[in-house]
Amino acid sequence: MIIPEAPPPPPPPDPTPTPSNPGVPAPLPGVYTDKGEAPRDEHFRGLIALPIRDMDGLESTLRSLYDPASPRFRKYLSTDEIKERHAPTEADVKVVTDWLVSQKLKVDAVAANRLLIYFEGTVGQFNDAFHVKLRYLSRKPPQEGNQPHLVFGLLEAITVPKFVEERIQALVSLDIDEPVEPIQPADNRDVGPPKEIEKGYTPKQISDAYGVSKLHAMGFKGKGVKLGVLIGGTYHHHDVMDFWQVFGVARKDARVVEPLGPPLLRIRESNLDVQWAGAIAPEADLVVYAAPDARNTSMIYSFNEMIGRGEVTVMTDSFAHREDSEPRAVRYFYMYSSMFAAAQGITVLAASGDSAGVDVPASSPYVTAVGGTLVGVKDGRAVWEIAWEESGSGTSLNLAAPEWQKGLPGIDSKRGTPDVALNAGMGYWYLWLGGWYSNIGTSFASPVMAGLVAVVNNARESQGKPPMGWLNPLLYTRKDVQATFRDITEGGTPKYKAQKGWDMPTGWGAPDAEGLYRTMP
């Protein structure tokens, strides 16, 4: 008997200092202004991303999952299958977390799909570990009226040992702590309908405009579908329940998941997202993933965690940020995370933004970007619809145009947005701390589209069909699916005009829920 030789021992970890890609902003004229070094005792929290394993294999799987001619069509991967095939290994995660701990940093969480590590410490500990000096930058928001706020920034690349650099994708985010605001209860007794109801749209009017009411009438209201809503902070429970009650939406309360602990503040945006997603799909199981605040670290982790846990089949994110003001690592991480969603059969929808530019996470080709229109609704139907001048639109700075977008107007080598569009320029009603407000934005359009998808998935399930999952490949390649969209040919942004067929301000146009149900294979 020949005894095989033992394999040689692995080489020792290479400690050579190696530059790595930071997802932390640098000074940028008109966006980020340097305010000097951050004090060493300041607290930070951040995210490190690890790379997808076998990217070529994942891309091949995605092509087959969304090819009607493939025997693998819509045979989505489970969370366990995608981790086994494509998630970073537990061993690699341990190498990185052990190194962080050795640098006196605290590791608080590892994402369910192992794509992210959440860690914290002081600025001094970070500077020593990564051989940099963190700075304060003042960030100017692109929307008028929003006040600048402080963020961390860098003037140089981080440096880590080579054995760490080989195992990470990027430092994706680094954030200052959000000031804790007291979450006061609101007195919502005797809340009735808005006094001047004609100044905003109701859930019934929007459902009529986009064909959702037709599916409601057929008995499909989202039953059995888990609809995910990503929010920053928390929403006001009584506002949400009263909104639904006033507008005749009979539904159960949302279930709230807090991936990083309890909320630090209440955010108006979160109220409207939950109210409208739940109203359009009244029988869907609403699952709200509540980040502690709306900073990148909290939102990116919670976005990915909703995907990693794999319990929803459609999700919406209205917390959009201009792509040109986000570091490259942020843009790419949203793409990698949403690739996992596509493989799992999760439809990811995101507001395309309200500043006529390109936003993240909508710039990811694995996300369906929801742009904006202005719609007129009368007698239970849309009577006119044009492109909204602030509809987030354009081509990505970095992310490549997928094959199914090449050759479209304005598309050269980069991904174009949006993919679809719904009302964003005419007011929607929402309830905030017991008071009625009518407001605009793609922040409404994305949860409405998510509710629409949930209702369509409910109808598909009744026919034995799986959820639609990643919408984009079939939306861009199926003429019968495109034909169900209301083509928007008038209006536009300062840069792009609506035209026949796909265009930058509105994508393929406005969806019709019944048409999508009838045509999507």
How would you name each of these model-derived features?
Residues 2-7, 11-110, 118, 123-372, ...:
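Substrate-binding/charge-relay-adjacent region of secreted/lumenal peptidase catalytic domains
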Residues 361, 388, 404, 430-431, ...:
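Short clusters of hydrophobic/aromatic residues that line enzyme substrate/ligand-binding pockets
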Residues 376-383:
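Short acidic, Gly/Pro-enriched loop/turn segments at secondary-structure junctions
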Residues 380, 434-436, 492, 501:
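Detector for glycine-centered tight turns/loop "hinges" at secondary-structure junctions
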Residues 384-401:
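Metal-ion-coordinating, acidic/His-rich active-site neighborhoods
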Residues 453, 457-504:
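An often Trp-containing, charged/polar helix-loop segment at the C-terminal end
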